[in-house]
């Protein structure tokens, strides 16, 4: 998810979190939230929240801890040949990693999500999912950092929201540009690019009136 300030990235992350938490139980799904601006601090219900990190150092530790669990889910760590044949070789909840302001986490060459790199190619099979947001400014170069490049190579979908067209091509044939908040171009491999408008995440009860 790419977009500059006030385009609706954080709102959409909150919307995704709420929708998944409403749909899946705490036994089925857990979130890891990486949130340097604290815009998602109350986005995930407590029962679904497996970990929260507000800076690059803590994010790196959280990612490393999750990686230990993911290692147990990899096919070579499973002895049951029938489970391998069926594709059901992991137990436990699906893990959704929500990342806002990825550009802030990777400032000064930091790579706090590097522990996930060995698992991105197998993410779908081991119950690992990423929703990552960063600004458009600097994205043309940043999309080739190891983690984002791994996501792109795995066939991840993308949403290009408001930003400077001068940043260049962000996905094949897709450039940022002026857009109202919440609007962007949805990019998915093998499908035509679509213009979409995202919804507004209503405030959680504890935030109403605050």
Where are the predicted features?
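Phosphate-binding and hydrolysis-coupling loops of NTP-dependent motor/remodeling domains
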Residues: 12, 133, 140-210
């Amino acid at each position: 998810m790419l977009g500059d300030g006030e385009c609706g990235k954080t709102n959409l992350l909150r919307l995704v979190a709420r929708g998944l938490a409403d749909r899946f139980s705490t036994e089925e799904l857990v979130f890891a939230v990486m949130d340097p601006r604290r815009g998602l601090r109350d986005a995930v219900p407590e029962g679904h929240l497996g970990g929260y990190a507000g800076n690059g150092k803590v994010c790196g530790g959280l990612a490393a801890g999750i990686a230990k669990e993911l290692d147990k889910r990899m096919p070579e760590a499973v002895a049951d040949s029938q489970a391998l044949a069926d594709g059901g070789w992991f137990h436990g909840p699906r893990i959704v990693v929500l990342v806002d302001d990825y550009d802030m986490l990777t400032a000064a060459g930091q790579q706090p999500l590097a522990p996930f790199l060995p698992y991105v190619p197998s993410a779908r099979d081991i119950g690992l999912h990423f929703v990552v947001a960063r600004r458009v400014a600097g994205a043309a170069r940043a999309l080739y950092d190891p983690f984002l490049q791994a996501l792109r190579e795995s066939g991840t979908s993308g949403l290009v929201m408001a930003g400077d067209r001068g940043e260049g091509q962000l996905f094949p044939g897709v450039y940022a540009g002026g857009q109202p908040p919440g609007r962007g171009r949805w990019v998915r491999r093998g499908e035509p690019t679509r213009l979409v408008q995202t919804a507004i995440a209503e405030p959680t009860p504890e935030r109403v009136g605050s």
